[in-house]
Design a protein with these regions (language model features):
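Residue-level detector of intrinsically disordered/flexible regions characterized by low predicted structural confidence
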Residues: 4-5, 333
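Sec/Tat signal peptide C-region and signal peptidase I cleavage site
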Residues: 16-21
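Mature catalytic domains of secreted/periplasmic carbohydrate-active enzymes
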Residues: 23-471
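Positively charged n-region of N-terminal signal peptides that target proteins for export
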Residues: 1-4, 117
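Bacterial N-terminal signal peptides
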Residues: 6-15
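Intrinsically disordered, low-complexity segments enriched in glycine/proline and serine/threonine
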Residues: 5-6, 133
Length: 471
């Protein structure tokens, strides 16, 4: 994944009308969507849509260095790619590869990660089995550039991906394997005969078909290692590096990969990011949120900090910011995959754990308005966002409150108004709230004793039978 300084990050702490984040994406979002035809895949997709909140874990050699993922070995000139200008590119790249001999996460405990995520209200995980640098966090037989051949090789937990997947399954997560299609360590992708001027393969596939076929086979076999049952049930195959695609002359033969994956893992969701078609079972806008409600399945992947992996100086979003982001995404019909970067020793930063605890406190009281919901045609009125239970017809209004400000005495919204005689329940307290309706405007008197700093207050009601309330 790519770090890009976008308007979303710049606006994170500002009080904006409606509190909607900017619609700027780090990668181009697919403009078309193709629904899966396999009923089992559709069923898995529906179950995934119920989960709403997941954890994306970036962890690897870049964590040891405390830098922005593996992008520093890409020679593109970008201000977000850090590299010591006093060191030649080739020398830097050699030093980066050598980090395999230093990465030794002796406090690695993925069960603690899973418990922290569960306390935060997360229900699925996507773990980086291999980022663009090619360093595998699983026991691959296709390359020696893996955690099984570095400083951690003699530790019983060396097959990190297996430990992660097992730990998260024990906490009842849906489990996803992140896998980078580009591999900058592979001589079949970056051939050492030539310079490596960009993230893309550095030779002509047309002139060197054998070499690219070797890369396709290498990619197929690595994915097969993750899919063949050695790592248990995998619910999502999350493929990054969308510039490796047929439309850019770099096919890895996705039909063959998908057939193999579903042969081992029936009904697995396949997410070939930003490549529209049958192998992108849901879309993944990065670092942003679509401007409008979308009925196709989608997920915004957004880091808790500025970076995906661990950077010691990173600045993290507040719990209120994350909750506001989650509320907006769910009201528009999507899921939030929140990026978390463990430290090189294998522990989560204390600031991350503290924020996850606070997010979980709010979801513990108000999660009914988030989980197992779907979006409504009228999904928003200023700072109020609306959702509906997937079953049963219950409606929800979630009013996002100004961070750092006293809780108001009353809140109001237009649209999705309960009809006279309906009961409105404040989810935070579980009690009936006093409300009035004038025309299409609902005004609710907030109950006393709400926690200071509450980021949002949610209400539920049942529509009266046979009556339309969405006016």
């Amino acid at each position: 994944m790519k770090k890009t300084v976008v308007v979303f990050l710049m606006l994170g702490g500002m009080a904006l009308p409606g509190r909607s984040v900017a619609q700027t994406f780090a990668h181009g979002q697919s403009s078309a969507y193709e629904w899966p035809t396999d009923p089992a895949v559709r069923e898995r997709l529906e179950a995934w849509q119920d989960l709403k909140f997941g954890m994306l874990i970036h962890w690897g050699l870049y964590s040891q260095l405390g830098i922005v993922e593996s992008w520093s070995i890409c020679s593109e000139e970008e201000d977000w790619i850090p590299r010591d200008s006093a060191v030649s590119y080739d020398a830097y790249k050699r030093a980066y590869w050598a980090t395999i001999d230093a990465f030794k996460p002796e406090r690695f405990d993925p069960s603690a990660w899973a418990r922290a995520g569960k306390r935060a209200g997360m229900n699925y995980v996507v773990f980086t089995t291999k980022h663009h640098d090619g360093f595998a966090l699983f026991d691959t037989r296709q390359s020696d550039f893996s955690i099984m051949h570095g400083a951690f090789k003699d530790d019983p937990r060396a097959n990190a991906a297996k430990w992660v997947f097992d730990a998260f399954r024990r906490e009842d997560y849906m489990v996803g394997a992140y896998f980078s299609k580009p591999d900058w360590h592979s001589p079949y992708y970056w051939w050492d005969r030539y310079a490596t001027p960009s993230r893309r393969h550095n030779y002509s596939i047309e002139k060197n078909p054998w070499r690219w076929n070797q890369f396709k086979e290498f990619t197929f076999k690595q994915i097969e290692e993750l899919m063949n049952g050695d790592y248990g049930r995998i619910d999502i195959l999350w493929l990054d590096g969308g510039w490796v695609r047929p439309g850019r002359g770099a096919s890895v033969d996705m039909p063959r990969i998908a057939a193999m994956a579903r042969g081992y893992q029936p009904s697995i969701l396949i997410v070939d990011r930003t490549v529209p078609g049958e192998f992108e079972n849901y879309r993944t806008p990065e670092r942003g949120i679509p401007a409008e409600r979308e009925e196709d399945p989608w997920e915004s992947c957004i880091p808790l900090g500025n970076d995906w992996g661990y950077v010691p100086t990173d600045v993290y979003k507040s719990p209120a910011e994350v909750i506001h982001i989650l509320v907006e995404i769910v009201a528009k019909g999507g899921n939030l995959l929140l990026g978390i970067g463990p430290k090189p020793d294998g522990t989560l930063p204390e600031e991350v754990v503290a924020r996850m605890e606070e997010i979980g406190k709010w979801l513990g009281a108000n999660g009914e308005a988030i989980y197992n919901t779907r979006s409504l045609p009228v999904f928003r009125d200023a700072d109020t966002w609306f959702t509906a239970a997937r079953e049963g017809g219950k409606r929800y209004a979630i009013v996002c409150l100004d961070e750092g400000q006293p809780i108001p005495r009353q809140v109001s919204w237009k649209g999705n108004a309960p009809l006279p005689g309906g009961r409105l329940t404040c989810l935070q307290t579980g009690r009936t709230a006093r409300w009035t309706r004038k025309g299409n405007v609902v005004t609710v008197t907030l109950p006393k004793g709400l926690p200071a700093g509450l980021p949002a207050v949610a209400f539920s009601w049942l529509p009266l039978e046979g009556r339309d309330q969405d006016r």
